[in-house]
């Protein structure tokens, strides 16, 4: 599945999601229809979330997909094995993965991204510098759709290592 995502289009548009939703409706696939309706509603909510309407870009749609994925994964973690809600979330996650951009979860790749970003921005690692670190790291981590549940412990470990070295 990961290989498939490499050659597939990187960005998902709201139009593509709506086409898939219409196909699911036509085929009578209620679970797929439910997931797609929910994603489209969340994306449309972002479009009108401020005082003025913003354009629903591919980036916003992808951000919505990644947020929805995280919500499902968190729900799966909270439910015991075999629980009906967990089974439902797992099914929804399988459907979502078809549309969701690849999320960076590999610790080594995330650590490399963190180190490169800090070096490129000439930011020193340290607890007193954490605000500045996060200011440069967050956009880079979000751009790569890095899993923040993996990234934050790496950042905290790097800070503790830097403090113990000094």
Regions found by a protein language model. Name each.
Residues 2-166:
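Charged, compositionally biased, marginally structured helical/coil segments
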């Amino acid at each position: 599945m990961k290989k498939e995502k490499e050659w597939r289009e990187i960005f998902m548009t709201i139009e593509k999601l709506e086409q898939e939703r219409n196909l699911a409706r036509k085929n009578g696939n209620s679970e797929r229809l439910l997931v797609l309706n929910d994603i489209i509603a969340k994306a449309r909510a972002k479009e009108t979330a401020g005082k003025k309407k913003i354009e629903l870009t591919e980036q916003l749609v992808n951000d919505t997909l990644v947020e929805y994925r995280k919500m499902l994964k968190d729900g799966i973690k909270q439910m015991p094995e075999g629980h009906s809600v967990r089974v439902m979330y797992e099914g929804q996650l399988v459907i979502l993965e078809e549309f969701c951009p690849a999320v960076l979860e590999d610790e080594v790749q995330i650590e490399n991204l963190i180190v490169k970003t800090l070096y490129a921005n000439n930011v020193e690692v340290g607890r007193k510098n954490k605000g500045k670190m996060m200011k440069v790291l967050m956009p880079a981590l979000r751009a790569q759709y890095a899993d923040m549940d993996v990234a934050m412990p790496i950042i905290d470990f790097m800070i503790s290592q830097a403090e113990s070295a000094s």
